[in-house]
Amino acid sequence: MEGYREGVNEAGGEFLDNETQYANATADLAVTAMEGIMSKYPEGVAIICSNNDDMALAAARTAKDNPNYAKTIFLGFDGQKSAVEAVLNGELTMTAAQNNFDIGYKAVETIVKILNGEEYGDVDTGTEIITKDNAQARLDNFADWLK
């Protein structure tokens, strides 16, 4: 949450601490949460940040027919194929794609360090922000990865 808060504040926005909605990482609960947000803020909000792509897609689809949410940014995390396709077709604004290969590789590398009694620090596997500008390239990568 701290990262969201810092980002919103740095952009000059107002982070609504009391509006954090927990959806247990499920699309169904994200729909309910988004309906509640639209009810409480009928004028719209600037951004909806979700902790995974499924929740972001559910929120965006719930709000799609509400004209006051037409300019709302919907951000997901994971960079899964369905979300990248949704970014490309304009249904989702962006997703923060994780590098699954590096996550696995770095996890094994860190485990080996632990087993060998070696020091290890924070592990950053990187993130790529997927927008309409680079969504097709990411989809092309999926095709290559799945050969």
For every predicted segment, state its role.
Residues 14-17, 71, 91-92:
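A generic structural signal for alpha->beta connector loops
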Residues 4, 19, 23-85:
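Hydrophobic alpha-helical
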Residues 6-11, 99-147:
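Hinge/cleft segment of the Venus flytrap/periplasmic-binding protein
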Residues 17-20, 74, 95, 129:
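Conserved beta-strand scaffold positions in the cores of enzyme catalytic domains, especially
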Residues 48, 74, 88, 102, ...:
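Short glycine/serine/threonine-biased micro-segments
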Residues 7-14, 33-40, 62-66, 86, ...:
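Structured segments of extracytoplasmic/periplasmic soluble domains
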Residues 89-101:
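Short beta-strand elements at the ligand-binding edges of bilobed clamshell
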